């Protein structure tokens, strides 16, 4: 199970990173939206493995982070599906998002609160890794930097920023996945590879 979770730490971000290649005039589009939504399944599976490791050192903080992460993944799926439906129904010029203004309390719960929770969860994850010394400082720095820059790439749709953020995430998560994979081969009693 731990090896599958380690692999998922790479697969999720790579699928997510493919989405900007399919954006259509600054919109997620059908394919980009599906890639965003689908990426959350392996990514959250891998991050649950990280939660298990973090809760040994900081149970309350790890639990709160997991809650924030799940809310963020809800927002990620919602925005991915919004892009899918916007593309499928031919809605352009942000008309699809503008229609959510007609449903303020519901769109707040589905999009506007959970959406920012994803980069916030990534920042908290990086901070937790640093605090618990569960990863090298450069991994945590890449994750935190990507979390801060994420809104520029995804909300403002600055494609070059989205690509840079995705590369930062893939590099950091690939290293974390490699370390998680190696921990599955360690003899019992050895520290968790930090």
Each language-model region and where it sits:
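Hydrophobic, aromatic-enriched alpha-helical segments typical of multi-pass transmembrane helices
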Residues: 1-194
């Amino acid at each position: 199970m731990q090896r599958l979770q380690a692999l998922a730490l790479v697969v999720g971000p790579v699928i997510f990173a493919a989405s900007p290649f399919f954006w259509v005039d600054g919109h997620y589009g059908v394919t980009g939206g599906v890639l965003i939504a689908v990426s959350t399944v392996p990514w959250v599976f891998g991050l649950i493995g990280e939660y298990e490791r973090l809760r040994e050192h900081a149970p309350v903080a790890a639990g709160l982070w997991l809650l924030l992460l799940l809310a963020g993944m809800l927002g990620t799926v919602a925005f991915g599906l919004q892009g899918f439906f916007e593309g499928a129904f031919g809605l352009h010029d942000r008309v699809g998002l503008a229609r959510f203004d007609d449903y303020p309390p519901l769109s707040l719960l589905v999009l506007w609160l959970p959406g920012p929770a994803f980069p916030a969860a990534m920042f908290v994850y990086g901070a937790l890794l640093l605090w618990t010394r569960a990863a090298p400082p450069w991994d945590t720095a890449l994750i935190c930097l990507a979390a801060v820059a994420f809104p520029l790439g995804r909300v403002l749709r600055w494609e070059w920023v989205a690509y840079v953020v995705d590369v930062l995430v893939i590099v950091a998560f690939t290293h974390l996945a490699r370390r998680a994979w190696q921990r599955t081969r360690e003899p019992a009693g050895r520290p968790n590879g930090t």
